[in-house]
Amino acid sequence: MKNIYFDNAATTKLDEEVLKEMMPYLKENYGNASSVYSLGRESRKAVEESREKIAKLLNCKPTEIYFTAGGSESDNTAIKGIAHSYREKGNHIITSKIEHPAVLETCKELEKEEFEVSYISVDKNGTIDLEELKSEIRPTTILISVMFANNEIGTIEPIKEIGKIAKENEIYFHTDAVQAVGNIKIDVQELNIDILSLSGHKFYGPKGIGALYVKSGVHFKKYIDGGHQERNKRAGTENVPAIVGMGKALELAYHSMEEHNSKIKELRDYYEKRVKEEIDNIKINGNIENRLPGNSNISFKNADGEGILLNLDMQGICASSGSACTSGSLNPSHVLLAIGVEQELAKNSLRISMGKYNTKEEVDYLVDNLKQIIDRMRKV
């Protein structure tokens, strides 16, 4: 049975053009990028060209881009790195209640080190409360960390406004942009972003590679000791094929963003239209207007979310009930609870995240099966 993939917020299929770009560095140009001989110099050149591509697309300097193993490492490095570097200035961090576990768990670890963390509320759409954010700022606040777009409900946060608040109060601003990069054109200068996390596999690039943008002049502590790679900020031999792949993937994403987003949004809206018309007792979660183009999070009354997923899987349909990083948890989504969804209804959610390879025929197949599954579950 062919799989029909609707979980692009969890990961995306590697683009064939990206794979083609990576192949020479897996087969012929396999030299260590830190080596001085020609094979190593070829690898170094490829790494720096990819760094330049990413920097140009984010409107920053190549020296402000640091390669990591992915979004979680980038988030950990950003938050712990700033906290430990500026502890003498203060010990207070502000974040939101709907962040990815890579941010929330990092903040919880810092609380064990006597850092203080304020968790800002969001409204029913998942949008951060800017007035509460302002009211939580203290003389000891050193960092604000708010995600660019939510991985479960797709809500896009008012990043420019948050960046302005942070700048006016001389506080560093980090955004987990893992879901946004590749879907939204981001200018770190215009948005007053000091630190930004991204991950290659969210925009049709390879897994196991990410990056951290850190504005010049912002200091952060390193957490992997050893060699002097990444300007002595992250030890370890560079993953050259993955770095090359991520640079190519982001370049492709930017060049075709409007076209793909328009198509993906059209499919998402068609899916929701059919669901609203053909299945009763549903609730669409998140900001209907201001969200990622492929995201749809719907709760189905009297139909267990895990049961829906298992039944969809039996029909070859891949979907999710929320963050892939919390799968296996019996607890309802912290994001849905934060936006006021009742606990039972939060357990009955289905996240569909569409991508550039999805088709209208696949959406029809999804809804046709979903109708039958919900009907069966409600009759039990």
Regions found by a protein language model. Name each.
Residues 1-380:
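Pyridoxal 5′-phosphate
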